[in-house]
């Protein structure tokens, strides 16, 4: 479980200090949290399907997911205030490292024709966002128990000062990026 955290402390931290010439140990980039979210859209109309999505995300994350509700009514989207619009879970500490380890070593290699994650997902502040098309790549998910397949957004929030540091941190952890750039 803590394989990734040990790897970070033993080999990644010193590599980051050496590459970016970091003097203050508090400025060494570290992953703060991982947020997994699903915008339910049409799925939100059926309470049973929405609960199934929440259960699936909870199973994948290893932590209970919360159903997010609309803050405002938007007539164009046919959404009222308080209407369920998605599911999300925020992972920190041990759960975060366990999820990242599972994502990198088990789930992503199971994706058909996977060539790596795009490098365009960095936001300029050292955070990385990417989407997955379906949840079936995770070993916990049983195909028979899914009412409808759905994708998910994954945000990796780091303390990196810029995208270059964040990208190097994620590369050293083992996130498979596409070749180039």
Swiss-Prot record:
Gene3D superfamilies: 3.30.1440.10. InterPro entries: Ribosomal_uL5, Ribosomal_uL5_bac-type, Ribosomal_uL5_C, Ribosomal_uL5_CS, Ribosomal_uL5_dom_sf, Ribosomal_uL5_N. The keyword Hydrolase does not apply. One of its GO terms (biological process) is translation. Keywords: Ribonucleoprotein, Ribosomal protein, RNA-binding, rRNA-binding, tRNA-binding. Transmembrane segments: none annotated. Pfam families: Ribosomal_L5 (PF00281), Ribosomal_L5_C (PF00673). GO terms for cellular component: ribonucleoprotein complex; ribosome. GO terms for molecular function: rRNA binding; structural constituent of ribosome; tRNA binding. Belongs to the universal ribosomal protein uL5 family. This is one of the proteins that bind and probably mediate the attachment of the 5S RNA into the large ribosomal subunit, where it forms part of the central protuberance. In the 70S ribosome it contacts protein S13 of the 30S subunit (bridge B1b), connecting the 2 subunits; this bridge is implicated in subunit movement. Contacts the P site tRNA; the 5S rRNA and some of its associated proteins might help stabilize positioning of ribosome-bound tRNAs. HAMAP family: Ribosomal_uL5_B. PANTHER family: 60S RIBOSOMAL PROTEIN L11-RELATED. Part of the 50S ribosomal subunit; part of the 5S rRNA/L5/L18/L25 subcomplex. Contacts the 5S rRNA and the P site tRNA. Forms a bridge to the 30S subunit in the 70S ribosome. This is Large ribosomal subunit protein uL5. It comes from Campylobacter jejuni subsp. jejuni serotype O:2 (strain ATCC 700819 / NCTC 11168). The gene is rplE.
